[in-house]
Amino acid sequence: MRYSQYFIPTVKETPSDAEVISHKLMLRAGMIRKLAAGIYNYLPFGLRSIRKVEAIVREEMNRAGAIELLMPAVQPAELWKESGRWEFYGKELLRFNDRKDAEFCMGPTHEEVITDLIRKEVRSYRQLPINLYQIQGKFRDEIRPRFGLMRGREFIMKDAYSFDVNEAGADVSYEKMYKAYRRIFERCGLKFRAVEADTGTIGGNYSHEFMVLADSGEDAIVSCSACEYAANMEKAETRKGEGIEHADPRPMEHVSTPGQKSIEDVAAFLGVQNTQVVKTLVLVADGEPVVALIRGDYDLNEIKLKNHLGCAELEMAEDDVVVKVTGAPTGYAGPVGLAAKVKVVADLSLEGMHNFVTGANAADTHLKNVNIGRDFSVSGFVDIRNVVIGDACPRCDSGKLEIWRGIEVGHVFKLGTKYSKALKATFLDADGKEQTIFMGCYGIGVGRTVAACIEQNHDENGIIFPIPIAPFQCIISSLSVKEDEVKAASESIYQELLEAGIEVLLDDRDERPGFKFKDADLIGIPLRIVVGAKALAEGKVELKERRSGEVEVLPIAEAIAKVKAAVKEALQV
């Protein structure tokens, strides 16, 4: 491809609305352009990288025995109502009515559609197992689309669905996909980790996320210092801790705390540690208020609480709800003498804790020496907090938990019979008895994988693409396009590389060398051959590796051979 005939609209200045480095560089390198919030045009240069990831995904899916199909982006509401997700999925599901007033949605995922297909076509155990996948555009109406392709509303996704006769078969399918995902991300040149994860709106029994390690990652990843335990923050488990205060219960007393609302302020005012203060949080679960109690130095994990309650929607209560439940303004809520009868859930950190401080459900007032059981009751002690660095590992006795940042690029789910039961997807077994199909589903964010790669592979000059997903593998910077010798040599090298199957971009623009070098660094093509009059007079060219910055002046044939060898090595499967 000749640069002068290609479309790579690079820009020198960083766009003001771009926050993370991948968003900034994808805009500057002419890979994407914003159309609307969370919706992007994939420009030719960016699309080449997208297609590289898709090709790797297809090869590994096919190798694992999955079969490609394509399903509609528009889905009828009745399928989602049948599965129970029409209301559960929430506002991220973009719903609309057609001209006949029939309800539809733009598919953010395809569990209902694929299950409907299978229930109509599969009759016998002889037709199972089967694994079907597609690579297709999805739409999720994110409340805060941001970070470019990291959290868009419209995105490209590979989703696969496995169907088995029993749980043992489903486990085999899950393991095949797990291994295929590891191969995919290894081939893309990514540093990643597979971690236990919450199943979220997809549901099911068990899941793993594949997280690309990056300081800019939205997600927190938890791992053990001594064993293989790893999970995302939503899923990471805590152990029951020791009670902070073991003294016998003391008489509860009201104390005046004028203007003291935060945990830190209250603790300092009363001369106690944050660990001796209990937060009383009022939330609304499916329209009903609920109270969560947690130690003052910890943060509530809303996903854990939501899963415990089994609700579809969970959010912090507005001030008027807090007043209705507690009888006091926000900042002074406590579990003793609540104005309304609500469910009270306590974190494990409170089990065995005595003589702690809480709000008194009255303005400018707190309670000291509060004790569970004597002063109020809870529905149970549940793990509803975020882990912190140094927590004991829930799986081994010696390890401590560490926290990293990561970007989710893939997710595998063991669904069990969640969708097949709801949609009545069954088969006849060898004895002629009707059985429910066991399912799994497996997703990869294709555009997000490219963005995550850039987050992990860049420097101050621009992108550093790994060869397997680089839009081009080599760029030829022809420095003096008006000099016949330079032009001819550049053309000869270009043709030889093309004939060898190398994806090469010939920069034949009539621009200054520095301008071309800056563009080459920005767009991140892994290998660069520089053809200039001075070196060419000796039959040589300059070969530069983008990642290491290493520069060699070599005979033309040797430079070409090195490019071929580097590409061949990088693409070995």
Swiss-Prot record:
Per the UniProt entry, what are the Gene Ontology biological process annotations, in alphabetical order? Answer: prolyl-tRNA aminoacylation
For this UniProt entry, the molecular function terms from Gene Ontology, in alphabetical order, are:
aminoacyl-tRNA deacylase activity; ATP binding; proline-tRNA ligase activity
Query: Main localisation, per the record?
Result: cytoplasm
| Database matches in InterPro entries | aa-tRNA-synt_IIb, aa-tRNA-synth_II, aa-tRNA-synth_II/BPL/LPL, Anticodon-bd, Anticodon-bd_dom_sf, Pro-tRNA-ligase_IIa, Pro-tRNA-synth_IIa_bac-type, Pro-tRNA-Synthase_IIa_type1
UniProt keyword Aminoacyl-tRNA synthetase present: yes
Superkingdom in the source lineage = Bacteria
Alphabetically list the UniProt keywords: Aminoacyl-tRNA synthetase, ATP-binding, Cytoplasm, Ligase, Nucleotide-binding, Protein biosynthesis
Q: Which reaction does it catalyse?
A: tRNA(Pro) + L-proline + ATP = L-prolyl-tRNA(Pro) + AMP + diphosphate
Keyword Cytoplasm assigned to the entry: answer is yes
Q: Name one GO cellular component term.
A: cytosol
Q: What class does this enzyme belong to in the EC scheme?
A: ligase
Return the Pfam families for the record: HGTP_anticodon, tRNA-synt_2b, tRNA_edit
Its EC number(s) = 6.1.1.15
- Cell compartments where the protein resides: Cytoplasm
Family, per entry: Belongs to the class-II aminoacyl-tRNA synthetase family. ProS type 1 subfamily.
> Domain notes, please?
Consists of three domains: the N-terminal catalytic domain, the editing domain and the C-terminal anticodon-binding domain.
Subunit-structure text: Homodimer.
Q: What does this protein do?
A: Catalyzes the attachment of proline to tRNA(Pro) in a two-step reaction: proline is first activated by ATP to form Pro-AMP and then transferred to the acceptor end of tRNA(Pro). As ProRS can inadvertently accommodate and process non-cognate amino acids such as alanine and cysteine, to avoid such errors it has two additional distinct editing activities against alanine. One activity is designated as 'pretransfer' editing and involves the tRNA(Pro)-independent hydrolysis of activated Ala-AMP.
Q: What is the designated name of this protein?
A: Proline--tRNA ligase
Q: What is the lineage of its organism?
A: Bacteria, Pseudomonadati, Thermodesulfobacteriota, Desulfuromonadia, Geobacterales
